Amino acid sequence: MAVVLRLSRAGTHKAPFYHVVATDSRNARDGKYIEDVGIYDPTQQPERIELKAERIEHWLKVGATPSQTVAMILKRAKKTAQPAEKKA
């Protein structure tokens, strides 16, 4: 079973938001999933990104591969989570 971290679409017509889920790669986009590991809402300003970092880390250690979009979201979330460096 190849586990993938990818987006599952939810919301209404023209107002989508996405669940970040761990699922078998053969399952449909909005089909059943193993675990819900976060939320991504691109319609809000600024974008709403809520991730369960420890669960995502677990799935990556076990061998799950993130989709291109989820990899981009993870990278963006890491940038915003790091504190800004102070200049002396």
UniProtKB/Swiss-Prot annotation:
Report the InterPro entries cross-referenced here.
Ribosomal_bS16, Ribosomal_bS16_dom_sf
Annotated GO CC locations: cytoplasm; small ribosomal subunit
User: Pfam families in the record, alphabetically?
Assistant: Ribosomal_S16
- Gene3D superfamilies linked to this entry: 3.30.1320.10
Q: Which UniProt keywords apply?
A: Ribonucleoprotein, Ribosomal protein
**GO BP field:** translation
- A GO molecular-function descriptor: structural constituent of ribosome
The answer to whether UniProt assigns keyword Ribonucleoprotein to this entry is yes
Intrachain disulfide bonds: none
Q: Note whether Membrane occurs among the keywords.
A: no
* The family this protein is said to belong to: Belongs to the bacterial ribosomal protein bS16 family.
Q: What is this protein called?
A: Small ribosomal subunit protein bS16
Where does this protein come from, organism-wise?
Answer: Anaeromyxobacter sp. (strain Fw109-5)
Q: What is the lineage of its organism?
A: Bacteria, Pseudomonadati, Myxococcota, Myxococcia, Myxococcales
Query: Coding gene?
Result: rpsP
